[in-house]
Amino acid sequence: MAEERNFRKVRRGYVVSDKMDKTISVELELRTTHPLYGKVVRSTRTVKAHDENNQAHVGDLVSIMETRPLSKTKRWRLDSIIERAK
């Protein structure tokens, strides 16, 4: 009997740095509702993602997927490039 893989998180964000080899920095926008006032509060988080072929560049809108730890700070990998930078 084959084991099924657990659900993996998928996020969308913009590439803010591609200066590292096989690694990109992606800025994710988090939207949360304030518990008392109900206002939607936007905040950002920057994560590092694995880009095996160095195909993503600064400004690209990308989809990243959660994966096993690849290094001290990398826990995401590039899933697809949704839109290229203009």
Curated annotation (Swiss-Prot):
GO terms for biological process: translation. The keyword RNA-binding applies. GO terms for cellular component: cytosolic small ribosomal subunit. One of its GO terms (molecular function) is structural constituent of ribosome. CDD domains: Ribosomal_uS17 (cd00364). It holds the Pfam family Ribosomal_S17. The keyword Cell wall biogenesis/degradation does not apply. InterPro entries: NA-bd_OB-fold, Ribosomal_uS17, Ribosomal_uS17_bact/chlr, Ribosomal_uS17_CS. It comes from the Bacteria. Keywords: Ribonucleoprotein, Ribosomal protein, RNA-binding, rRNA-binding. PROSITE patterns: RIBOSOMAL_S17. PANTHER family: 40S RIBOSOMAL PROTEIN S11 FAMILY MEMBER (PTHR10744), SMALL RIBOSOMAL SUBUNIT PROTEIN US17M (PTHR10744:SF1). One of the primary rRNA binding proteins, it binds specifically to the 5'-end of 16S ribosomal RNA. Belongs to the universal ribosomal protein uS17 family. Part of the 30S ribosomal subunit. This is Small ribosomal subunit protein uS17. It comes from Bifidobacterium animalis subsp. lactis (strain AD011). The gene is rpsQ.
